[in-house]
Amino acid sequence: MMIRLRRAIDSAVTQLEEAGIGSARCDAEQLAAHLAGTDRGRLALLDTPGEEFFRRYSDAVAARSRRVPLQHLIGTVSFGPVVLHVGPDVFIPRPETEAILAWVMAQRLPERPVIVDACTGSGALAVALAHHRPAARVIGIDDSDSALDYARRNAEGTAVECVRADVTTPALLPELDGCVDLFVANPPYVPDDPVVQSILEPEVTQYDPRHAVFGGPDGMALTADIVGLAGRWLRPGGLFAVEHDDSTSVPTLDLVYRTDLFDDVLTHRDLAGRPRFVTARRRESWSA
C-alpha cells in the first residue's frame, strides 16, 4: 500500500474512532476499497490513487464520522451468500438475521417449496433463500414502496415475487392458505420507548426508516398478526420463524403457544447469545 494511502487510512481511523465508531479500521478500509473499486484485502496492491480519490475519500470519511451508515456510503451490504443493494429508504439487514437463514438451511423442505418472507425490506431473507433453494417459489411481502424497490432490484435474476401488502390486513392473500412450506418474518420489533431509543446507535435512530425499526410501545405491534398468518398460510408440517427483540422472547413464545396450532416451538439465540427468534412447526391436524 502506498505511503500516502496508508496515512490517509490511518487518519480516517483516528477520525472515526473520535466519532465513537467501534469498527473504525474496518470502515476506513472498506470506504477506501469501495472508492478505489477493489476489495479490502487488495488495498495493499493498489497503485497510488489520484487526487480525486483522496478528495472523495475525505468526504466519505467525514460522512461516516457523522454516523451515516457505512452501507449507505458504499451502497451494499453482505447477507449470507448474497450482496444486497441498500440505501436511506430501506432497513439495513443485520447479521443477527443470518441466524434465521442458518436455521432454515438446516431444515428439510420439499423439493419445490413455497416460501414467504414477511416484512422483507431489502429482500434479504427472500433473496438469500432463493439462492439456497433455486427451485422454490419465494414471495417477499412489504408495505413500503421504497423497500420493495430495493427488494426487486436485489431479486433480479431470481424467482422472488415481491408483493406490496400490509400484514395486518384481514384475510390477506387467501390463496396462500394451507399452501406455504416455510414462513419467515423479520418485523419491526424494537420497543418505541425513550429509554430504549437512548441506547441505540445513531445509525439506527437517525438513518434507518422508523417504520422498519420500531414495533410499537412493546415492540410487538405486528407479531400477533404474523403469527396468525403463519397459522393460516402454513401447510400441516410447515415451518415458521419470526425474529424478535431480545426483551420479547417469552411474549413471542406465548403468542405462538396460545394459537394451539404449532408444535416444536423453540427460542433461538443470536451469535451474541441473546434470544433472537422463535421457530415452530405447523401441526399436522388443522383442528385447534
Swiss-Prot record:
Q: Which reaction does it catalyse?
A: L-glutaminyl-[peptide chain release factor] + S-adenosyl-L-methionine = N(5)-methyl-L-glutaminyl-[peptide chain release factor] + S-adenosyl-L-homocysteine + H(+)
Name this polypeptide is given:
Release factor glutamine methyltransferase
Q: Which PANTHER family match?
A: HEMK METHYLTRANSFERASE, MTRF1L RELEASE FACTOR GLUTAMINE METHYLTRANSFERASE
Which molecular function terms from Gene Ontology are attached?
Answer: protein-(glutamine-N5) methyltransferase activity; protein-glutamine N-methyltransferase activity
User: Where does this protein hold substrate?
Assistant: N186, P187, P188, Y189
Query: Native species of this protein?
Result: Mycobacterium leprae (strain TN)
Tell me any Pfam family this protein matches: PrmC_N
- InterPro entries according to UniProt: HemK-like, Methyltransf_25, N5-glutamine_MTase, PrmC_N, RF_methyltr_PrmC, SAM-dependent_MTases_sf
Q: Which GO terms describe its biological process?
A: methylation
Give the protein's function.
Methylates the class 1 translation termination release factors RF1/PrfA and RF2/PrfB on the glutamine residue of the universally conserved GGQ motif.
For this protein's source organism, the top of the classification is:
Bacteria, Bacillati, Actinomycetota, Actinomycetes, Mycobacteriales
Q: Which gene encodes it?
A: prmC
Q: Which family does it belong to?
A: Belongs to the protein N5-glutamine methyltransferase family. PrmC subfamily.
